[in-house]
């Protein structure tokens, strides 16, 4: 893989959130049967169940605004960990919700897939 892990993380994140914000039903090719999503308190495994969960979320319009993006190599095999924080604008809400998301990306030929995906809304105390 010719991309360094920071460039990979930036490219992946831009693609993922652009796809999520325009048509999240098309995210299935980023996951595999062994992939796992933890979305708040729900845990799902497999691309089909993950996409069904994402499509069922109760909003029509969404926009992710990334505040921070950190990446690290996760193994000698080329795995990459990506942590994102940002703001989530849902439907016509004026006040964004804060979120955090972590991706564990695994090399697959000339590309990567999401092995683990952890999403959490961050509420102020």
From Swiss-Prot:
Domain NTF2: 8-121
Keyword tags: Acetylation, Cytoplasm, Isopeptide bond, Protein transport, Transport, Ubl conjugation
Record function comment: Facilitates protein transport into the nucleus. Interacts with various nucleoporins and with Ran-GDP. Could be part of a multicomponent system of cytosolic factors that assemble at the pore complex during nuclear import. In vitro, the NTF2-Ran-GDP association, in the presence of GTP, triggers dissociation of the karyopherin alpha-beta complex, allowing nuclear translocation of karyopherin alpha and the NLS substrate.
PROSITE patterns documented for this protein: NTF2_DOMAIN
Taxonomic superkingdom: Eukaryota
Annotated compartments: Cytoplasm
Source organism: Saccharomyces cerevisiae (strain ATCC 204508 / S288c) (Baker's yeast)
Underlying gene: NTF2
Membrane spanning residue stretches: none
Entries under CDD domains matching the protein: NTF2 (cd00780)
One Gene Ontology term from the biological process aspect of the record: protein import into nucleus
Pfam families listed in its UniProt record: NTF2 (PF02136)
Cross-link (Glycyl lysine isopeptide (Lys-Gly) (interchain with G-Cter in ubiquitin)): 53
Broad class of the protein's primary localization: cytoplasm
Residues recorded as bearing N-acetylserine in the entry: 2
Any GO MF annotation of the entry: nuclear import signal receptor activity
Gene Ontology cellular-component terms listed: cytoplasm; nuclear envelope; nuclear pore central transport channel
The protein, known as: Nuclear transport factor 2
